[in-house]
C-alpha cells in the first residue's frame, strides 16, 4: 500500500509518499511543489496540477491524506482554497481515496496532543519513519505527518 500526504498551499505544496511493506513504513519520497511568486495565479495553479499529476503517475499511491483548511482572515485564504481545489481534483481524477484531517487531529494522532509543537510533530515523524535527519523543508515533514495520520487510521501504528 502507498499513501501520499499533502500539505496544501499556493506557494508551496508539501508532499510525502510512504509505502507499507511487510508491516514496515518506508519513506519513498518527500518534498515540495514550489510555484514562483512572480507568476500569475492561474499559472501557479496549473503548475500544481501538472507536478502533482506527475508525482501520482510515478508513485501510484492507493490512498491520499490532505490537511483540512480552516478559514482565517488573511489575504492568502482564497489562493490556498483554490490550490486545495486543484489538489482534490487531481486526486479524484486518479480515483484515489481521499481523507482529510484538521491540524489538531494530525498533532493528536502523531504526537499525542492536539496542541503539539512543530518540533514534537517532527520528532514523531522521524521516529515513525526511522529517519536519522528531519525531512526538509518543513512542508514535506508536515505532509508526512498527514500521511502517517491516515496510516494510523488504517491500523498501521
Swiss-Prot record:
Catalytic activity as recorded in UniProt: Endonucleolytic cleavage at a junction such as a reciprocal single-stranded crossover between two homologous DNA duplexes (Holliday junction)
Active site location: 7, 67, 139
Pfam family, one: RuvC
Subcellular location per the Swiss-Prot or TrEMBL entry: Cytoplasm
UniProt xrefs under CDD domains: RuvC
Molecular functions (GO terms): crossover junction DNA endonuclease activity; DNA binding; magnesium ion binding
Gene3D superfamilies assigned to the protein according to its UniProt record, in alphabetical order: Ribonuclease H-like superfamily/Ribonuclease H
EC number(s) reported in the record: 3.1.21.10
GO annotation (BP), single: DNA repair
Requisite cofactors: Mg(2+)
Similarity comment text for this entry: Belongs to the RuvC family.
Function of the molecule: The RuvA-RuvB-RuvC complex processes Holliday junction (HJ) DNA during genetic recombination and DNA repair. Endonuclease that resolves HJ intermediates. Cleaves cruciform DNA by making single-stranded nicks across the HJ at symmetrical positions within the homologous arms, yielding a 5'-phosphate and a 3'-hydroxyl group; requires a central core of homology in the junction. The consensus cleavage sequence is 5'-(A/T)TT(C/G)-3'. Cleavage occurs on the 3'-side of the TT dinucleotide at the point of strand exchange.
Protein name: Crossover junction endodeoxyribonuclease RuvC
Amino acid at each position: 500500500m502507498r499513501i501520499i500526504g499533502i500539505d496544501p498551499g499556493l506557494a508551496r505544496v508539501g508532499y510525502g509518499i510512504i509505502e507499507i511493506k511487510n508491516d514496515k513504513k518506508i519513506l519513498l519520497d518527500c518534498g515540495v511543489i514550489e510555484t514562483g511568486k512572480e507568476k500569475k495565479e492561474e499559472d501557479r495553479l496549473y503548475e500544481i496540477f501538472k507536478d502533482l499529476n506527475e508525482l501520482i503517475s510515478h508513485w501510484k499511491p492507493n490512498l491520499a491524506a490532505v490537511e483540512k483548511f480552516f478559514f482565517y482572515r488573511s489575504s492568502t485564504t482564497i489562493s490556498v482554497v483554490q490550490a486545495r481545489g486543484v489538489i482534490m481534483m487531481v486526486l479524484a481524477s486518479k480515483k484515489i481515496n481521499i481523507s482529510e484531517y484538521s491540524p489538531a487531529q494530525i498533532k493528536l494522532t502523531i504526537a499525542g496532543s492536539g496542541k503539539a509543537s512543530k518540533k514534537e510533530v517532527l520528532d514523531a515523524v522521524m521516529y515513525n519513519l526511522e529517519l536519522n535527519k528531519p525531512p526538509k523543508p518543513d512542508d514535506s515533514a508536515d505532509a508526512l505527518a498527514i500521511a502517517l495520520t491516515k496510516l494510523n487510521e488504517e491500523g498501521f501504528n
